[in-house]
Amino acid sequence: MGRKQNENEAHGNSAKYDPSFRGPIKNRGCTDIICCVLFLIFILGYIIVGLVAWVYGDPRQVLYPRNSTGAYCGVGDNKDKPYVLYFDILSCAAAINIISIAENGLQCPTPQVCVSSCPLAPWAVEVFQFSKTVGEVYGERRNFCLPAVSPDMIVEESLQKGLCPRFLLPSTPALGRCFPLPNINFTLPEDLRINNTTVSNGISGLLDSINARDVSVKIFEDFAQSWYWILVALGVALALSLLFILLLRLVAAPLVLLLIVGVLAVLAYGIYHCWQQYQVFRDKGASITQLGFTTNFSAYQSVKETWLAALIVLAVLEGILLLMLIFLRQRIRIAIALLKEASRAVGQMMSTMFYPLVTFVLLVICIGYWAVTALYLATSGQPQYIYWASNTSTPGCENVPVNMTCDPMAPLNSSCPNLKCVFKGYSTTGLAQRSLFNLQIYGVLGLFWTVNWVLALGQCVLAGAFASFYWAFHKPRDIPTFPLSSAFIRTLRYHTGSLAFGALILSLVQIARVILEYIDHKLRGSQNPVARCIICCFKCCLWCLEKFIKFLNRNAYIMIAIYGKNFCVSAKNAFMLLMRNVLRVVVLDKVTDLLLFFGKLLVVGGVGVLSFFFFSGRIKGLGKDFENPNLNYYWLPIMTSIMGAYVIASGFFSVFGMCVDTLFLCFLEDLERNDGSQERPYYMPKALLKILGKKNEAPTGGKTRKK
């Protein structure tokens, strides 16, 4: 007895009875004010970064292609010309990179022009046509020349100056650019030395992009055909999730028992199977001494020692689980009772089930703001132009300052006939451009901090609502009228700083994990096993640290929602309270995880099976208006429905999990604060009182507990 008391004292003193305590404290003050001020200053800086990015950035260089002069195709004067045509795409196709072109502009040493449509048929200028005019030779194809070319210009002169293309290839638009189509037979003049094989080899790096475009079109068509059925599947997932949670008050005990028996049965079958395999290989005399060491791990399945080791491991797990059932059965009953009470709490406050929608909207705002800011920062800078000549060996072009900067508005006073001032890219010499890396790092920190703050806000708000349910002595009479909105306003008003403190700690650990993942990716080709081992150990340690901080933050937010203390005090009190009841914590955590995993499996699996049978045509539609959609890839709406069902189930069950954790901490506080007397009655439900062998004294003289 003395030893147990010393252990409890090592984990802090039990909560003392407070006659004024009636649930989440209403008269509270602001907590972690310094962190709140720092967070608000950081958000202000984040907004300034966004404004700087908006002023200097130009995302059009990613969204729209550009011609040789740097003008955008598809906007402004080129609104009706959304595609860019390369005069000689084979001169750059070998080193082309679609994403690089989208981000950096001109990458090919060939003129580019905005066009309304891509060429549909092969065509080329014959040698005998060089002396004719552009209007005579090109005709309607003159729109593929640069706008400045005159129809009376001689063709040979226009080709020397790079004003018109010598040939056209059948092309398809992809990412706003005209790319030649592969595997199409055509013939061009022999002096060009261009044929179907040359084009196919030259644009081999672009074929995947073209194919990807075709696939993307088919995917879009499938979504257009099946979007309403996907919404139906998501509605089924929502209904199943809500129904599962509400029915837990009725089926929690048999369901948990069924799951535990199922785990025991699976382990028992594993032991039986391992024993059978062990006997087979023992009779054959297959031993590891005969096999020796090998890197072919599948070979170890053919030796008796492998199956014996697996048998021992499964037998140990089976024994541990049986011992837990025997010695921790009362704690399992407590966990089941808390699950039932959580289901009851959710039923009394149905609005809490839809709070994840608020979290989702806030997360979309945070992630969207970061993405737009990062895009604008990445595209900041002033356009730069350089001199370029298609053939520097032409008479008069020997001393041309190629690659030197120029002004596109200034006249070209040069003897070189094909000299041009073309767009090169965007400068990196401005203030915003020199600080680009630092601003992007600031944005990444802002992303992690704001996202974690939004998640912390949701946890604290839900904890405040569910705590008001537990500490209502007469349910539902004593439950506040608007518990969720009251908790939301209370959290924002008093505890923004505390949430920011916890979110910052978690964000720093997550950023460290991202940096380690990047280093590990860079060292993946390294042959240094020591460095790889060290990185792996650091990753493992940071993963464990992140899990612990998430667990600590979650319980700290519950204590903040109830008592209104600062983050450090709340985290300490929550940790000490849990350490004084560590066995109950472990049992409740595992039982809840098992139950919620089964719930997710039920929802996602049910929606997945129904989607598969419907979209694959195995279930016919209900009448003419509800026919099965004709799809290119029937697995696409199936996977979309499954992922959507998982997101919905995770959102609903995260609320339920927060409810269980909140009620559990309140239950532990209730045990320490109260003793069941008239002055200090227990707030827990009768089922928990019965399991613990406790009861509240009946009020005498018709007295009832004051609110």
UniProtKB/Swiss-Prot annotation:
Residue runs in coiled coils:
none
Question: Pfam families in the record, alphabetically?
Answer: Choline_transpo
Q: What is its main location?
A: membrane
UniProt cross-references to InterPro entries, sorted A to Z: Choline_transptr-like
Q: Tell me the compartments it is located in.
A: Membrane; Apical cell membrane
Per the record, ranges on the Extracellular side are 54-227, 272-307, 378-452, 520-557, 616-635
| Side Cytoplasmic, residues | 1-32, 249-250, 329-356, 474-498, 579-594, 657-707
The UniProt transmembrane annotation reads 33-53, 228-248, 251-271, 308-328, 357-377, 453-473, 499-519, 558-578, 595-615, 636-656
Q: In which family does this protein belong, per the annotation?
A: Belongs to the CTL (choline transporter-like) family.
Q: Does the keyword DNA damage apply?
A: no
Name any one GO molecular function. Answer: thiamine pyrophosphate transmembrane transporter activity
In its UniProt entry, what is this protein called?
Choline transporter-like protein 4
Topology term for the membrane: Multi-pass membrane protein
Q: Which UniProt keywords apply?
A: Antiport, Cell membrane, Glycoprotein, Membrane, Transmembrane, Transmembrane helix, Transport
Q: Name one GO cellular component term.
A: apical plasma membrane
Biological function: Choline transporter that plays a role in the choline-acetylcholine system and is required to the efferent innervation of hair cells in the olivocochlear bundle for the maintenance of physiological function of outer hair cells and the protection of hair cells from acoustic injury. Also described as a thiamine pyrophosphate transporter in colon, may mediate the absorption of microbiota-generated thiamine pyrophosphate and contribute to host thiamine (vitamin B1) homeostasis.
**Chain's gene name:** Slc44a4
Q: List the disulfide bonds.
A: none
Tissue-level expression reads:
Expressed in colon and cecum.
Residue positions with a glycan: 67, 185, 195-196, 296, 391, 403, 413
Q: How is it modified after translation?
A: N-glycosylated; N-glycosylation of Asn-67 and Asn-391 is required for a proper thiamine pyrophosphate uptake.
